[in-house]
Design a protein with these regions (language model features):
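Short conserved active-site loop signatures built around small residues
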Residues: 180
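Short beta->alpha junction loops/turns
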Residues: 121, 176-177
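Active-site histidine-anchored catalytic micro-motif
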Residues: 183
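Short loop-beta-helix segment that forms the pyridoxal 5′-phosphate
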Residues: 169-175
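Conserved "HGTGT" condensation-loop signature of ketosynthase/thiolase-family condensing enzymes
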Residues: 1-169
Length: 187
């Protein structure tokens, strides 16, 4: 069987990140070079309450300038995973040096040829947990109407696509730890 050669080249034009060692790319990169670990002890009471065997985690650092990067409406209508996706996407867009704040206002970008390929392991789990608690404690009429769009794994790609006015596609890969690698192949 012949080996398949990749004929496509990938060009990374901008970087964006929200990681346990930094809320943006410069901080993440500087801390990675210093060997900083993002692993910390989880001190919340629920660790003991549920007798969890794991008490450490790689918690995300506070995104740099978070209040400048999200409006109050965006913060309210997006699950934390969607908030982080949008913050990282905006940083990548800015890092790419495009002339406008989205695909419609940037001269060098065609919105009809601009898409989003997003990888996630689970999507809006915090929204799902909050909705479950609200349903149990207060009843179905108190569950937020935005619950479904906020918890769907493809909600993050949709939020980024709508915000950047990328009209070509909004694709989501959900394949555990390989999600982002597979999303890059789509992009």
């Amino acid at each position: 069987q012949e080996s398949v050669k990749m004929s496509r080249k990938v060009l990374v034009t901008g970087l964006g990140a929200t990681t346990p060692i930094g809320g943006d790319v410069p901080t993440t990169w500087a801390n990675a070079l210093k060997g900083v670990s993002g692993i910390t002890k989880i001190d919340e009471p629920w660790v003991e309450e549920y007798s969890l065997p794991v008490y450490i985690a790689g918690r995300l650092a506070e995104p740099a300038h978070e209040s400048e990067r999200l409006t109050k409406v965006e913060a309210k209508r997006l699950d934390p995973s969607g908030q982080l996706a949008l913050i990282a996407a905006r940083e990548a867009w800015e890092d790419a040096g495009f002339s406008g704040s989205d695909a419609e206002s940037a001269e060098e970008v065609d919105p009809l040829r601009t898409g989003v390929a997003f990888g996630t392991g689970i999507g809006g789990v915090w929204t799902l947990l909050d909705a479950w608690d609200t349903l149990r404690e207060k009843g179905p009429r108190r569950v937020l109407p935005m619950t479904v769009p906020m918890l769907m794994p493809n909600g993050n790609a949709a939020a980024v696509s709508m915000n950047l006015k990328a009209r070509a596609a909004a694709q989501t890969v959900v394949s555990a730890c390989a999600s982002s690698t597979e999303a890059m192949e789509l992009g």
